Amino acid sequence: MAKIIAVANQKGGVGKTTTSVNLCAALSLMGKNVLLVDCDPQGNASSGMGVAKTQRPNTYDMLINGAAAAECVVHTDYGDVIPASKELAAASVELINAVEREFVLKKALMSLFSDYDYIFMVCPPSLELLTVNALVAADNVLIPMQCEYYALEGITDLLTSIKMCSKRLNRRLGIEGIVLTMYDSRANLTTQVANELRRYLGDKVYETVIPRSVRLSEAPSHGLPGVVYDRINRGSKAYMALAVEFIARSEK
């Protein structure tokens, strides 16, 4: 049975897509069966895995048009993908009147739970209905975040939302962990924020940190995860190390 992970942070530009793509690819390279479900209308995680944003059927078709999840899966050499496109932006509005609207994604994906070791759902940078659907479907939430001042405020809001979802909609929902991204060890603020997070959240913060990396930024333009595009750069090595730590935590 798959472990279901929502990758969420309501703040944009924190490395959510990069982390989703590279962690999925790293786990796949390690022999795990992984599915990435792109729930972000921007579709950047899809293209980062080499899947065109025009690919149909996709997440929108699965949620709104009744397409079977298995029909939406695209196979790649570094993990499976259910892609997203800009049409997904309308899904939150179209789901408003749906029966049990917060559970549509979970019901759609249930047929795939036994096919994978891990299923990652990439959430949009907001706490709207698509994100709520992912939180309801998930076992745990993985939170990528930058070490900057405003991130501390944002993480408090997100943890409150997760707690509320856990109380009302998904009692098993927990925090998988927090991944520090775009990490600059030379900056005093980075160290201060990291220390504050670890003081507040303890071992929920991963030991592995993800440094800034030009090669990771270049990889999506080639339709490849960074860990495939350039395996020896420090960003890729960090994501491979994160995958090892993720597996160790998951399989305790």
Q: For each predicted feature, which ranges?
A:
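P-loop NTP-binding core
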Residues: 1-252
